[in-house]
Amino acid sequence: MYLFHLCLVFACVSCPTVQASKLCLGWLWDMDIDPYKEFGSSYQLLNFLPLDFFPELNALVDTATALYEEELTGREHCSPHHTAIRQALVCWEELTRLIAWMSANINSEEVRRVIVAHVNDTWGLKVRQNLWFHLSCLTFGQHTVQEFLVSFGVRIRTPAPYRPPNAPILSTLPEHTVIRRRGSARVVRSPRRRTPSPRRRRSQSPRRRPQSPASNC
């Protein structure tokens, strides 16, 4: 596992981001560093969510590529969430290369199975949590994700007899949502507004109808 940690550091050291440094150094030396604190969240809140809540890595990577490919591959600094997603993708790419190298050089099928299972259950889970958090912040808004995590944590810590039947659902879009379509410019949703009802046309009664000069003759 030391080789895995070194690959993480080597993969992220070339990228001048504090977020990546916190993440990699914390994993390497087991430092008490929470990469979610600067976003108003914490590892504890994310750990309240069940393990099967987070989608598979392939699904998360496909989502990140489909929605934010231009931002992730460009040289501009879009937001801290984009930077964190970049580093998570780089770390996972190096991890998959390491697993492929180990699978090719280890003859024991049992050892390979144990190593792959351990990586998926530990570091793979951390990458899944990281990608889900930052993708959700970009999609729903950071404040909405914070409220969801707090609500879910409160529900989990509430005794079962007093717990509401349904868990919170992260499904509310913010007022301003940036939607990017492939091959086109960004489309910004305007704030939600109520559609005004059409004005009623006043019916003119016979008394109010203007009379023609011929009718007065």
Swiss-Prot record:
The gene is C. Residues 1-20 form the signal peptide. Residues 190-217 form a propeptide. The keyword RNA-binding does not apply. Keywords: Disulfide bond, Host nucleus, Host-virus interaction, Repeat, Secreted, Signal, Viral immunoevasion. GO terms for biological process: microtubule-dependent intracellular transport of viral material towards nucleus; symbiont entry into host cell; viral penetration into host nucleus. Residues 181-217 are annotated as: Disordered. Residues 181-210 have a biased composition (Basic residues). Homodimerizes. The record marks R189, S190 as: Cleavage. Phosphorylated. It is found in: Secreted; Host nucleus. It holds the Pfam family Hepatitis_core. InterPro entries: Hepatitis_B_virus_capsid_N (IPR013195), Hepatitis_core (IPR002006), Viral_capsid_core_dom_sf_HBV (IPR036459). Residues 190-211 are annotated as: 3 X 8 AA approximate repeats of S-P-R-R-R-R-[PS]-Q. It comes from the Viruses. Belongs to the orthohepadnavirus precore antigen family. This is External core antigen.
